[in-house]
């Protein structure tokens, strides 16, 4: 059985093809192709521009995936697409492409939850059996555990996602979005030597990142490290952040010098990743798990994997993570989750093949897993 998966919930358009042998053998990745919309430094990606990018590239990527997989249309059993969550216009573009292929090829559709796609691909690649899942990306931050055919959310962000926090600080510093702003933050952080105190906000199993972002934006503006316009206008600084800016300048002047861009990136990573380690460890203790699976684009971060590994080993456990081929948004994860659902008899009718920006992880009935 062969499934093709289309992913395009944000700025990455992915097409993947996976084979599940009829004899029950090991699944095999036949193709995994991706193209990214990269916005200029200091800017995020607008939904309309991202959707335009997806519409431009989707046909080329589908053709390239079929060629790489060395299969024809007749070999495909189902077409899987990201139903949500994500950005509206990009999701609509991919859903439209999936519906078009379904009509042209005469194949069944399968709508897939983006997060469930990450989880199932992570389980397949790493072999993790029943881990606590830390799902960290530009749009989502969740701590998840499986129970009774649902992926249950134990904790999550109360405001913005951790990846969004890192990406927006990259915009503040006016650094490149190529290959990804979070990746460039990580590279700068490796050169940082000074830990700057930042707000640390964990509330039970939940966390918050907007206050940390406001604080570090204020520091960057105060030190003249932010983008030119923001440095001049102090865009978006709250009253508390402005006070923090003045206090911090005085503090670091007294200590003999101010932090560098690298120090700020290092400090931001250390703070937000410590928060993620804390809530993940709490979930492990609650369910008695010794496994952690990190999925989502931020899961590629080597420092996050290192910090999580230290915690897990102290508990006699292990951390599982994938490389950028499968951690960053991709089409093969949608194909994997979709084919698992398809094998249980699940399909999405053409008239129901919509998309939604809000599609909770725990809304999905995970029929393919046994208790």
UniProtKB/Swiss-Prot annotation:
<feature type="binding site">
    <location>
        <position position="114"/>
    </location>
    <ligand>
        <name>a divalent metal cation</name>
    </ligand>
</feature>
<comment type="subunit">
    <text>Component of the EKC/KEOPS complex composed of at least BUD32, CGI121, GON7, KAE1 and PCC1; the whole complex dimerizes.</text>
</comment>
<dbReference type="GO" id="GO:0005634">
    <property type="term" value="C:nucleus"/>
</dbReference>
<keyword id="KW-0963">Cytoplasm</keyword>
<dbReference type="InterPro" id="IPR000905">
    <property type="entry name" value="Gcp-like_dom"/>
</dbReference>
<dbReference type="GO" id="GO:0005737">
    <property type="term" value="C:cytoplasm"/>
</dbReference>
<feature type="binding site">
    <location>
        <position position="182"/>
    </location>
    <ligand>
        <name>substrate</name>
    </ligand>
</feature>
<feature type="binding site">
    <location>
        <position position="118"/>
    </location>
    <ligand>
        <name>a divalent metal cation</name>
    </ligand>
</feature>
<dbReference type="GO" id="GO:0061711">
    <property type="term" value="F:N(6)-L-threonylcarbamoyladenine synthase activity"/>
</dbReference>
<keyword id="KW-0012">Acyltransferase</keyword>
<feature type="binding site">
    <location>
        <position position="167"/>
    </location>
    <ligand>
        <name>substrate</name>
    </ligand>
</feature>
<dbReference type="InterPro" id="IPR034680">
    <property type="entry name" value="Kae1_archaea_euk"/>
</dbReference>
<dbReference type="GO" id="GO:0002949">
    <property type="term" value="P:tRNA threonylcarbamoyladenosine modification"/>
</dbReference>
<feature type="binding site">
    <location>
        <begin position="135"/>
        <end position="139"/>
    </location>
    <ligand>
        <name>substrate</name>
    </ligand>
</feature>
<feature type="binding site">
    <location>
        <position position="329"/>
    </location>
    <ligand>
        <name>a divalent metal cation</name>
    </ligand>
</feature>
<dbReference type="InterPro" id="IPR017861">
    <property type="entry name" value="KAE1/TsaD"/>
</dbReference>
<feature type="binding site">
    <location>
        <position position="186"/>
    </location>
    <ligand>
        <name>substrate</name>
    </ligand>
</feature>
<dbReference type="GO" id="GO:0000408">
    <property type="term" value="C:EKC/KEOPS complex"/>
</dbReference>
<keyword id="KW-0804">Transcription</keyword>
<keyword id="KW-0479">Metal-binding</keyword>
<comment type="similarity">
    <text>Belongs to the KAE1 / TsaD family.</text>
</comment>
<dbReference type="InterPro" id="IPR043129">
    <property type="entry name" value="ATPase_NBD"/>
</dbReference>
<keyword id="KW-0805">Transcription regulation</keyword>
<feature type="binding site">
    <location>
        <position position="301"/>
    </location>
    <ligand>
        <name>substrate</name>
    </ligand>
</feature>
<keyword id="KW-0819">tRNA processing</keyword>
<comment type="function">
    <text>Component of the EKC/KEOPS complex that is required for the formation of a threonylcarbamoyl group on adenosine at position 37 (t(6)A37) in tRNAs that read codons beginning with adenine. The complex is probably involved in the transfer of the threonylcarbamoyl moiety of threonylcarbamoyl-AMP (TC-AMP) to the N6 group of A37. KAE1 likely plays a direct catalytic role in this reaction, but requires other protein(s) of the complex to fulfill this activity. The EKC/KEOPS complex also promotes both telomere uncapping and telomere elongation.</text>
</comment>
<keyword id="KW-0808">Transferase</keyword>
<keyword id="KW-0010">Activator</keyword>
<dbReference type="GO" id="GO:0046872">
    <property type="term" value="F:metal ion binding"/>
</dbReference>
<feature type="binding site">
    <location>
        <position position="135"/>
    </location>
    <ligand>
        <name>a divalent metal cation</name>
    </ligand>
</feature>
<keyword id="KW-0539">Nucleus</keyword>
<dbReference type="Pfam" id="PF00814">
    <property type="entry name" value="TsaD"/>
</dbReference>
<protein>
    <recommendedName>
        <fullName>tRNA N6-adenosine threonylcarbamoyltransferase</fullName>
        <ecNumber>2.3.1.234</ecNumber>
    </recommendedName>
</protein>
């Amino acid at each position: 059985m062969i499934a093709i998966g289309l992913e395009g919930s944000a700025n990455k358009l992915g097409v993947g093809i996976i084979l599940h042998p009829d004899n029950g053998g090991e699944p095999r990745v036949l193709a995994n192709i991706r193209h990214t919309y990269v916005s200029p430094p200091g800017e995020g990606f607008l939904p309309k521009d991202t959707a335009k990018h997806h519409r431009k590239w989707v046909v080329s990527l589908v053709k390239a995936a079929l060629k790489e997989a060395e299969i024809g249309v007749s070999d495909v059993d189902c077409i899987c697409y990201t139903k949500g969550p994500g950005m509206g216009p990009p999701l609509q573009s991919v859903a439209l492409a999936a519906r078009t292929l379904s009509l042209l090829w005469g194949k069944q559709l399968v709508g897939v939850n983006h997060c469930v796609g990450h989880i199932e691909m992570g389980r397949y690649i790493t072999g993790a059996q029943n881990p606590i899942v830390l799902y960290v990306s530009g749009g989502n931050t969740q701590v998840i555990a499986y129970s009774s055919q649902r992926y249950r959310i134990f904790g999550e962000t109360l405001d913005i996602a951790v990846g969004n926090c890192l990406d927006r600080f990259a915009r503040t510093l006016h650094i490149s979005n190529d290959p990804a702003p979070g990746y460039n933050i990580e590279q700068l952080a490796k050169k940082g030597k000074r830990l700057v105190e930042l707000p640390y906000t964990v509330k039970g199993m939940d966390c918050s990142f907007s206050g940390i972002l406001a604080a570090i934006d204020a520091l960057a503006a105060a030190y003249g490290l932010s983008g030119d316009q923001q440095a001049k206008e102090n865009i978006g600084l709250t009253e508390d952040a402005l006070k923090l800016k003045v206090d911090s300048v005085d503090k670091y002047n007294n200590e003999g010098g101010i932090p560098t861009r690298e120090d700020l990136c290092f400090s931001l990573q250390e703070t937000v990743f410590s928060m993620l380690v804390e809530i993940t460890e709490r979930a492990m203790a609650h369910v008695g798990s010794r496994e952690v699976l990190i999925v989502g684009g931020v899961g590629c971060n080597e420092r996050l994997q290192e910090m999580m590994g230290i915690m897990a080993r102290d508990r006699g456990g292990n951390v599982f993570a994938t490389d950028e081929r499968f951690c960053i948004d991709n089409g093969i994860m949608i194909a994997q989750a979709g084919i698992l659902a398809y094998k249980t008899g699940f399909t999405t009718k053409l008239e129901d093949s919509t998309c939604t920006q809000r599609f909770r992880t725990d809304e999905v009935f995970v029929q393919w897993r046994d208790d």
